[in-house]
Swiss-Prot record:
One Gene Ontology term of the molecular function aspect: UDP-N-acetylmuramoyl-L-alanyl-D-glutamyl-meso-2,6-diaminopimelyl-D-alanyl-D-alanine:undecaprenyl-phosphate transferase activity
Cofactor: Mg(2+)
TM regions (residue ranges): 17-37, 66-86, 90-110, 129-149, 162-182, 197-217, 232-252, 261-281, 286-306, 340-360
Protein name, entry field: Phospho-N-acetylmuramoyl-pentapeptide-transferase
GO BP terms in the entry: cell division; cell wall macromolecule biosynthetic process; cell wall organization; peptidoglycan biosynthetic process; regulation of cell shape
HAMAP family reported in the protein's UniProt record: MraY (MF_00038)
Keyword Cell wall biogenesis/degradation: yes
EC number: 2.7.8.13
Annotated keywords: Cell cycle, Cell division, Cell inner membrane, Cell membrane, Cell shape, Cell wall biogenesis/degradation, Magnesium, Membrane, Metal-binding, Peptidoglycan synthesis, Transferase, Transmembrane, Transmembrane helix
Reactions it catalyzes: UDP-N-acetyl-alpha-D-muramoyl-L-alanyl-gamma-D-glutamyl-meso-2,6-diaminopimeloyl-D-alanyl-D-alanine + di-trans,octa-cis-undecaprenyl phosphate = di-trans,octa-cis-undecaprenyl diphospho-N-acetyl-alpha-D-muramoyl-L-alanyl-D-glutamyl-meso-2,6-diaminopimeloyl-D-alanyl-D-alanine + UMP
């Protein structure tokens, strides 16, 4: 809407600035979540959409029972409303991301809603993967039939995060890469969302870093200087991601310890999906695990725990995901969360540093 006005009114030409719209996107989405947060929490309490706590979890978590969940509805609503207002809606990349966001949100919402109306287990795991796979198919079809960079060799390649060298993997290889990235990221963020504020801050950091990369890849000179693959219109993604960052920070206001609300699968699956989709568009599939190392660590801890128990009958950790392991070691929840935040910040800096190293190694 704002971009449309700038296109048709000469006096508002300045509103086309990516810097200005990114700033506005951050502020608007932050304010929406911040000011709508209290009444939304009150509404969820009235509807009794409260968190269920696993019986075998840390005893300190029993006090969280009944804490409103489905806060992801507020986050995603703020992001979508802000994006519609400030983004260029004729940009095909933005439309692709908006469509993906809505589809991931639908999966998460159905999962959350079923937990209160049908079964505490929510949507079956196989159905989740099936729906996530369908989103991956749409992303793959777009890249294969339309393209991103205008260079098929790049579009159908896996990019080395350090040297920026493209390894051609073809259409079939790209299909499986997209499925792994989308399912992996979406579910990893979901797994991480187990402590107050634990998932949202790493999400904010990763969103900010991807926003910076999106701006670089949409700029001919900067992308060339940093050995990134120029993608027409990707600068708009930095505007979208600023809205994600703002909404995330607004949510943290209520989600930090002790949490007044949880994001639920509506939030975690969708936010993880957004990271995955944009990383694919920007050809940063291998950079994402670096900046999102905490998400990778959490997912790996679950995989290793389940695998070890099935193969050896023994557990590696006191409890998985690994944040519960640290809790059972006697480390306070707030300290575990803060240390994970610090770890994400460190790996985020490493990811940005890796971009600068391109062309040197």
């Amino acid at each position: 809407m704002l971009y449309f006005l700038a296109e048709h009114l000469a006096k508002l030409e300045f509103l086309k600035s990516i810097y200005l719209r990114a700033f506005l996107g951050f502020v608007i989405s932050f304010c929406i979540v911040l000011f709508a947060g209290r009444p939304f929490i009150k509404y969820l309490k009235i509807k009794k959409f409260g968190e269920e706590i696993r019986d075998d979890g840390p005893s300190s978590h029993f006090s969280k029972k009944g804490t409103p969940t489905m806060g992801g509805v507020l986050i995603i609503a703020a992001v979508l409303l802000t994006s519609i207002f400030i983004n260029d809606l004729t940009n095909s990349l933005i439309l692709l991301v908006l469509l993906s966001t809505i589809m991931f949100a639908a999966i998460g919402f159905i999962d959350d809603y079923r937990k209160f109306t049908v079964s505490k287990k929510g949507l079956a795991g196989k159905k989740k993967l099936l729906f996530q796979g369908a989103i991956g198919l749409i992303i793959w079809a777009y890249i294969y039939f339309i393209g991103l960079t205008g260079r098929p060799m790049v579009d159908l390649s896996l990019i080395n995060p350090i040297s920026a060298y493209p390894y051609y993997i073809g259409a079939i290889g790209l299909f499986f890469l997209i499925q792994i990235v989308l399912m992996g990221t979406s579910n990893a963020v979901n797994i991480t969302d187990g402590l107050d504020g634990l998932a949202i801050m790493p999400m904010i950091i990763c969103s900010t870093i991807l926003g910076v990369i999106a701006y670089f890849t949409g700029h001919t000179e900067l992308s060339s200087h940093l050995h990134l693959f120029y993608t027409v219109g990707s600068g708009e993604l930095s505007v979208f991601l600023s809205a994600v960052t703002g909404a995330g920070l607004g949510f943290l206001w209520y989600n930090c310890y002790p949490a007044q609300i949880f994001m639920g699968d509506t939030g975690s699956l969708t936010l993880g999906g957004i990271l995955g989709v944009i990383a694919i568009i920007l050809k940063q599939e291998l950079m994402l695990p670096i900046m999102g190392f905490i998400f990778v660590l959490e997912a790996l801890s679950v995989i290793l725990q389940v695998g070890s128990f099935k193969l050896r009958g023994k557990r590696i950790f006191k409890m998985a995901p690994i944040h519960h392991h640290f809790e059972l070691m006697g480390i306070p929840e707030s300290k575990v969360t803060m240390r994970f935040w610090i770890g994400t910040l460190i790996f985020g800096i490493i990811a940005l540093g890796a971009i600068k190293m391109r062309g040197i190694l």
